[in-house]
Design a protein with these regions (language model features):
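Extracytoplasmic gate region of multi-pass secondary transporters
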Residues: 31-35, 215-270
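Helix-loop-helix hairpin linking two adjacent transmembrane segments in secondary transporters
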Residues: 142-190
Length: 296
């Protein structure tokens, strides 16, 4: 392998991974926009859609290690394509929703598919393809792309709902999701990189056992649990709250978009601070400020 090829492979994987997270994160964080219109169409309370959204997120958590294992065994590209296909099917299904079973089933399927084209598969591919000296920066770039996807896609989807209606907008989003298939092939280059050939093999069971023996892993998992609860709660219910306050529909979309863009800024800034200050103290500060924000 030539020197230029070695340098090109990580770049292609980063581009592909960034595009995947940009689209998948944008789709995932837009579901709160559908809470009111879908609930009104089904003539149900908001509890049904909220419950389905909770299952959506739960399936992302359950599916992530499963797709991670598939990625290790069959390659990141193949694993992500499977996830993308599930996402496309779920969006078609949700566009034609007719009752409780279809709304719960479509969101559950979407969550499972999102795990396949989400952080577990993408970050694993990027981590394998880049040199250890550039790994943190590369992972930060890809994660920032995901948050940027929330910034550009959520308000765009809110306009689609206003113009075409919620059902047809989901139909259009299924075509947007299909674009991810192109970028999933970029992840296959991670298997050809020199970095991916180093290290020892480890089964999924062995990896899980080793992780849960680590105090830092358990504490970090609890932190992500709290973070996920906050972010999902806001993403699902903020647009409905905005509507209840008689504000224009687009305000909810742009409110979620601002969360995405400031997440990009915060990720970069606190990543910078994390190399210079105590990460534990920074996390405590972040969660403390978030708690105060909810009280206000």
């Amino acid at each position: 392998m030539t020197s230029s090829s070695k340098n090109l492979i990580p770049l292609l994987v980063i581009i592909g991974g960034s595009a995947l997270l940009l689209i998948s994160f944008g789709l995932r964080h837009s579901f709160g926009l559908y809470l009111v219109p879908v609930s009104e169409y089904l003539n149900t309370g908001r509890e049904l859609f909220s419950f389905a959204s909770a299952l959506n997120v739960l399936m992302i958590g359950i599916g992530s290690p499963l797709f991670g294992a598939l990625s290790d065994k069959y390659g990141s590209g193949k694993a992500s394509i499977l996830g993308i296909i599930l996402v496309i099917i779920s969006l078609f299904w949700m566009a034609n929703v007719e009752g409780a079973f279809s709304i719960i089933g479509s969101q559950t399927l979407f969550g499972l598919g999102s795990a396949g084209c989400g952080t577990a598969v993408v970050l694993g591919a990027v981590g394998r393809s880049v040199h250890s000296a550039n790994r943190t920066l590369s992972l930060g770039i890809v994660m920032a792309a995901g948050s940027f996807g929330q910034f550009i896609m959520v308000p765009s989807i809110s306009y689609l709902i206003e113009i075409f209606g919620w059902s047809y907008s989901l139909f259009l989003l299924s075509f947007v999701a299909s674009i991810m298939i192109i970028f999933s092939f970029f992840l296959n280059f991670s298997e050809k990189s020199e970095s991916s050939k180093s290290g020892t093999s480890q089964t999924l069971t062995e990896a899980i056992k080793e992780a849960f023996k680590s105090k830092s892993f358990n504490l970090l998992s609890l932190g992500f649990f709290v973070c996920g609860f906050h972010v999902t709660f806001v993403a699902v219910h903020l647009p409905a709250f905005v509507k209840d306050e008689n504000l224009p529909f687009w305000v909810g979309g742009w409110a979620l978009a601002l969360i995405g863009i400031f997440n990009v800024i915060g990720t970069i800034y606190f990543g910078y601070l994390g190399d210079r200050l105590s990460k534990k103290n920074l996390l405590a500060l972040l969660y403390g400020l978030r708690g105060l924000l909810f009280l206000l």
